[in-house]
Amino acid sequence: MRFTFPLMAIVLEIAMIVLFGLFVEYETDQTVLEQLNITKPTDMGIFFELYPLFQDVHVMIFVGFGFLMTFLKKYGFSSVGINLLVAALGLQWGTIVQGILQSQGQKFNIGIKNMINADFSAATVLISFGAVLGKTSPTQMLIMTILEIVFFAHNEYLVSEIFKASDIGASMTIHAFGAYFGLAVAGILYRSGLRKGHENEESAYYSDLFAMIGTLFLWMFWPSFNSAIAEPGDKQCRAIVNTYFSLAACVLTAFAFSSLVEHRGKLNMVHIQNATLAGGVAVGTCADMAIHPFGSMIIGSIAGMVSVLGYKFLTPLFTTKLRIHDTCGVHNLHGLPGVVGGLAGIVAVAMGASNTSMAMQAAALGSSIGTAVVGGLMTGLILKLPLWGQPSDQNCYDDSVYWKVPKTR
């Protein structure tokens, strides 16, 4: 850790600086016009029109995701700190990879949409991070960030440019992809020594409150996430409204099913922290489609139910039978709701809510899951090499391995 991590971080940042010097320029007014398909003259005002949405997404990435993962009682520093590290590297690398793909290897101009998409690429890695939380080193996370974004960007390009599928809120390309990529990595990195659990793999009263802060930030800003890159006008308005009501319906369903499946009808904080967000994930694919508010509420309700049931029944099954230990339960918050979103998109297209093809929507869902699993397995094999400073079983879920921590915790 003393030399491997600093060397890796410095080399990667030098590489980012060199790549930005070779490929990235400021965006010009003419480029803005072409990117947004606007024929009349405009100015850089479009940058500042989208900047509030970008800031909302930015808060979700750095505050929402970071604090959502602070539920482990002795892993708060790593949850927030490594989240910051991964996101900072991810947005730089995502800018480069996505830009090169779009420009076919030529220089490209950077604008507000590039910055939003860069944050989206970082979000994908943060979702996967949740599956291996507490069991990996900072060096391993840097490597995973570099590799995952390459797979993510190519799949996103395939979905949007080749299949021409609709996935404005990225239920398939970000949420399902990130979840199944993380599960594949977790499967390769499975530790038999942790099959009976670990004393630090639990929450405390204060850590659950911190995690709930992350939930609230994500919940409030999710309409911005799903509408940030939508076509201005009716589609962007629909994306905001549909997400707003899907999230609201999801909360009631999540609370109801949490009480239903828990002993004596008590609410489980794990369900409330996570399943209440599933509606935002699931409505993403068809957020900008004319599915009507009641349609978005149906999607949100289904997502909340599926998420709670996943936490209650599927997570233990994955650990004991499939040897996939999902620390944060990303399969239930992002994976299953992402699949629900993909299926909802197919149904919406079949009902005439979009001009895209049902076959291409299905292909996009299959591609996202397939690429994620293959990429995750390959990445997991690389991360398993014994030179990245991964913690021992005994030291998992403990900040003191990689951080200076106070004596009193």
Swiss-Prot record:
Membrane topology reported for the UniProt record: Multi-pass membrane protein
Cell location: Membrane
Glycosylation: residue positions: 37, 355
Tissues in which the protein is found: Erythrocytes.
Catalytic activity entry: methylamine(out) = methylamine(in); NH4(+)(in) = NH4(+)(out); CO2(out) = CO2(in)
Any one Gene Ontology BP term: inorganic cation transmembrane transport
Effect of residue 164 to Q: In DSLK or RHAG3 antigen (030003)
Residue ranges that the UniProt entry lists as topological domain Cytoplasmic: 1-2, 73-79, 135-142, 189-208, 261-268, 319-332, 384-409
PANTHER family per record: AMMONIUM TRANSPORTER, AMMONIUM TRANSPORTER RH TYPE A
Record family assignment: Belongs to the ammonium transporter (TC 2.A.49) family. Rh subfamily.
Listed name of the protein: Ammonium transporter Rh type A
Organism: Homo sapiens
